[in-house]
């Protein structure tokens, strides 16, 4: 993939973080290239769910995410935006940042079967979302994040990342991609 902005697109528990960890473990990317909204949330708010789950908190988290992405793109380095990014509004914000630096936008889609998604979510034992929330994200993904839609929004390239549905581990999926 060319240098620029890589946007991960997928519901919670779809394999985005596992994929990124596999890329790092395989030394395909530097950990510093990954800008994770979950990690920023933890940095800013620790384990205080009451503080971290508000519109004000989300604004702080995504402003910080954007700041980190800008810092990387401004110096010609790639950035990987690791958050759900299933809505056009979320992606528009990222595409606008990339355009400021004439950086290509590669979108990687994580689109597991809903049954696999709910199973993966259950295995994670997270309490910040419900299974119904995860299903809702999947519905939005199906409606608003098809490959043609992503291209029409400004993605230079769109790739589907294989996962459980294709009997592919995160490491096997990571091996199918290369980053410049």
Q: At which residue positions do the language-model features occur?
A:
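Loop/turn-to-beta-strand initiation segments
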Residues: 75-79, 104-106
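Conserved phosphate-donor/acceptor-positioning beta-strand/loop module used by diverse small-molecule
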Residues: 101-120
């Amino acid at each position: 993939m060319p240098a620029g902005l890589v946007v991960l697109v997928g519901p919670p528990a779809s394999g985005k973080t596992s994929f990124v960890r596999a890329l790092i473990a395989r030394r395909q990317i530097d950990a510093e290239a990954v800008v994770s909204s979950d990690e920023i949330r933890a940095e800013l708010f620790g384990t205080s769910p009451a503080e971290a789950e508000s519109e004000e908190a989300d604004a702080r988290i995504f402003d910080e995410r954007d700041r980190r992405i800008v810092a990387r793109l401004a110096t010609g380095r790639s950035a990987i935006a690791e958050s759900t990014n299933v809505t056009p509004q979320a992606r528009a914000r990222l595409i606008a940042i990339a355009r400021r630096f004439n950086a290509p936008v590669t979108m990687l889609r994580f689109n597991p079967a809903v049954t696999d998604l709910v199973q993966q979510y259950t295995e994670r034992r997270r309490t910040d979302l419900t299974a119904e929330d995860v299903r809702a994200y999947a519905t939005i993904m199906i409606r608003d994040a098809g490959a043609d839609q992503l291209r029409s929004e400004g993605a230079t390239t769109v790739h589907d990342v294989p996962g459980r549905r294709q009997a592919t581990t995160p490491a096997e999926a990571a091996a199918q991609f290369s980053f410049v």
